Amino acid sequence: MIRVATLDDAQELLDACNGHELRVDPDFEAMPLSEIIEFLNGYEEPAHTLVLDDGGIKAVMFIQTSTPRNRVEPDFFTIGTKAQSKQLFDAGFAWLEQNRKGFDVRTFCNKLDTELLAMFEESGLSFLRDYFKMVKEPIEKGFPDLPANISIEAADLRTNSQLLHRLEAESFAQHFGYMALDHDHWLAEKLAEPQLDHQGSFIAKVDGEPAGLLLSSDGRADVNGGWVDKLGVLEKYRGLGLGKLLLRWGIAHAADKGYRSIGLGVDTGNESGALQLYENQGFRPTVVWRGYSTTI
């Protein structure tokens, strides 16, 4: 039967999700229970989660909604048969058709997941973009030395929310797929993230003027790893090495917390030089997430 999942299903959902991913890629970094709970609760808005239960959960679709972006993101995992997978996949999109008409849909899966990729294409979804998950391990302690005219300062997210919001929106304005939120929605979304690193927000300044930001997450804490949530530099300050300094600052911050590694996500089509920067600092791709889209 198809039913709505609850928090009571969290452990079984974790087993199903990791079973799906490890079947596709035996080297996949297993998801922690905290991530499943986050999926179930939703981010700024409540999630809707459907499962196919046939003597146990065989497939799940977590549906996240961002009304300000007019976007929904369904995440699909299955350890069932092809018929069971298709049944829940179709039920999930039927729910979207009924409840999220007019919304843009973004969904992702491992590039190695040929079965799910085929289901995406058979359902009329269009290829969008590939994204790397990259990890650096081990990581080193020690914050980088800064030029005399550059500073990197810790910033409380609430107190400095107006500035951090502006720095993110302006530095990511030209990035593919980025959709800026207004300040209040942006702050609410950040504060709703249970894995937000409340000591991991930093602002880079050049001659005292705000020039870039770094936001950190504890989303990999279960595997003793940190995560770079956002790293951006305003266009007028690019070419000064701020991105490298901020990245090294984030690495040192993660090491100070006792983490052994740090990860981040990057658009493989990013033309800003970010991918080369990450590779030069020792990050290596661990997963290629393939993105698909459609409009309901």
Stretches with model-predicted labels:
Residues L7, H20-N99, R106-C109, V206, ...:
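Conserved donor-binding loop and adjoining core beta-sheet/short helix segment
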Residues T65, I79-I150, R290-T294:
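Acyl-donor-binding surface of acyltransferase catalytic domains
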Residues V105-F108, V228, I262-V266:
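Conserved hydrophobic beta-strand within the GNAT/NAT acetyltransferase core sheet
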Residues M1-D15, S151-R166:
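A short beta-loop-alpha structural element at the N-terminal edge
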Residues Q174-A180, D184-A188, A192-V206, P210-G219, ...:
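Phosphate-binding active sites in nucleotide-utilizing proteins
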